């Protein structure tokens, strides 16, 4: 078994006070993965399909999310289009991914607004927006205890290169029959694609959050903290639990014993299968930790060996609130 219920990555970070509300109507998954004949992943190695009459692309500088939900939904739509713009600069992608992440974190807490939010997106992107909203809702429903007024004993580091992680996901898919998009989704939720270094409250470790005893069985002698070794071990574990034989839900549930976790992974994987260009946005998502004082941004360079008061950190770093 991997980390049960409490995860050190995005699950722990994105949970909102009061939890979420289980909602129906999740869009159908579009299959394990989407690949091209030559082995390239559609949308990453080739230009994404154009959307009809897209809004003007997002600015390259960070933009604050509007307080009005409709205006925020319009900003999210612009960010989603920019992410899929083949000529978007790295700065534009950074800004769009940040706005996208903040929008889903905030708007995702309000299922009563989902229909409105989805309708504001271009038609070609509405399924992806719906999957992201449902994933946010499911992550909020994973039990994790009361919110704390302290920040975790973590070290936040830059992730491995986007291309290197993608190559690792692909290699694992080829070797073990586990879709690259599922591995990317797990890596995102467990450790924000390797940004979080530190133990979960359950004692799980590394980019894919293995318990040491499970690592002994599936790590193949590798380094639990090495991205490639951890990704390969996750694929090995999922394959052992039936993923490659079609038991996707069962394999994911074995990885983390929560149906909400399973559903969230499947939603994110579905976005990547529908349009893998979305990967370059997920790769840019940063670490936020929910406290009694609200979301706190933990940037690369955050490093504390023990929990610290959130109020003290925010006083020293007001931009993190």
What kind of feature is each model-predicted range?
Residues 8, 19, 297-321:
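Extended low-complexity, intrinsically disordered tails
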Residues 112-299, 309-315:
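Catalytic glycan-binding domains that act on GlcNAc-containing polysaccharides
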Residues 29-36, 50-52:
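Extracellular mucin-like PTS domains
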Residues 4-16:
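Hydrophobic alpha-helical membrane-insertion segments, chiefly the h-region
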Residues 13, 18-26, 56-59, 63-66, ...:
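N-terminal export signals and maturation junctions of secreted/periplasmic proteins
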Residues 41-53, 57-65:
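Non-catalytic protein-protein interaction scaffold segments in large eukaryotic complex-forming proteins
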Residues 24-29, 37, 42:
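Intrinsically disordered, low-complexity segments enriched in small/polar and acidic residues
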């Amino acid at each position: 078994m991997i980390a049960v219920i409490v995860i050190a990555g995005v699950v722990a970070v994105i949970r909102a006070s009061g939890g979420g509300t289980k909602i129906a109507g999740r869009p159908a998954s579009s299959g394990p993965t989407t690949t091209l004949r030559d082995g390239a992943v559609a949308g990453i190695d080739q230009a994404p399909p154009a959307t009809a009459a897209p809004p003007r692309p997002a600015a390259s500088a960070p933009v604050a999310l509007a307080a009005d939900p409709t205006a925020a939904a319009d900003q999210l739509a612009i960010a989603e289009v920019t992410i899929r713009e083949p000529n978007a600069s790295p700065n534009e992608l950074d800004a769009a991914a940040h706005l996208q992440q903040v929008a889903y974190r905030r708007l995702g807490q309000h299922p009563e607004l989902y229909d409105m939010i989805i309708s504001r997106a271009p038609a070609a992107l509405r399924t992806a927006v719906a999957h992201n909203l449902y994933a946010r809702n499911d992550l909020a429903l994973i039990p994790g205890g009361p919110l704390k007024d302290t920040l975790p004993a973590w070290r936040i580091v830059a992730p491995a290169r986007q291309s290197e992680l993608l190559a690792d996901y692909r290699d694992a898919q080829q070797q073990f029959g586990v879709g690259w998009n599922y591995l990317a989704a797990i890596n995102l939720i467990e450790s924000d694609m390797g940004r979080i270094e530190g133990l979960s409250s359950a004692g799980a470790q590394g980019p894919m959050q293995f318990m040491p005893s499970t690592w002994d069985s599936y790590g193949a002698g590798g380094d639990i903290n090495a991205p490639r070794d951890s990704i390969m071990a996750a694929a090995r574990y999922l394959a052992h639990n039936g993923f490659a034989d079609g038991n996707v839900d069962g394999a994911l549930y074995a990885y983390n014993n929560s149906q909400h976790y399973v559903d969230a992974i499947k939603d994110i994987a579905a976005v990547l299968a529908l349009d893998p260009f979305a990967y370059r946005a997920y790769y840019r998502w940063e670490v936020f930790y929910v406290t009694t004082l609200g979301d706190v941004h933990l940037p690369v360079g955050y490093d504390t060996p023990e929990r610290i008061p959130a109020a003290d950190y925010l006083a020293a770093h007001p931009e993190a609130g």
